[in-house]
Amino acid sequence: MTRKPYPSDVTDDEWAFVAPYLLLMKEDAPQRDHELRAVFNGLRWIIRTGAQWRMMPNDLPPWYTVYQQAQRWIAAGVFEDMVHDLRALLRLVKGKKEQPSAVIFDGRTVQSTPESGERAGYDGYKRKKGSKIHIAVDTLGLLLAAYVTPANEQERAQIKELAEAVQEVTQNSVEVAFVDQGYTGDDPKNDAKAAGIELIVVKLEEAKKGFVLLPRR
């Protein structure tokens, strides 16, 4: 690499891990005009900066090359495979089983931008317009699944999608999901049960206000 590096550039160790997932065709294939690592660095720059595709710096591959390759990677599911294997590796390093038996469901509202379009909704509880990200993580905080809705969608209504998603990526290993009080009610409980998961609501102590540490999960 002859250009000045960007903070978003992949390190040598990171590249050694991700490269096998990204090789949809040989690195020296005749139709490849740019090094694969340079294309991946272009994608990382876009993700890190949040800039428009057409604002890609001139010392990175053309924006349309990076965009088209990113679409191929997404269609091939390489990022899901990458996250799945990395999560399993990190769990084994921590002395845990490869797949979790307990997970955590939660949701977070993200402020909208002009580009949000129809995805934006109004979260009356948090008084914020935007999108709501519903996520599932294991007890180490490693991502299992994510689902995006308008901010006005309630967390409890997304249990079905999250429960089915985590069972798919963990080969049906999950038995318990911990949630906060935003997931109370029979519907979310039954939706989780249909996927073979027991939903456990962790309640805050009513007498306490402000920051409260929930029981260890």
Model features per residue range: what roles?
Residues 1-217:
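Short alpha-helical elements
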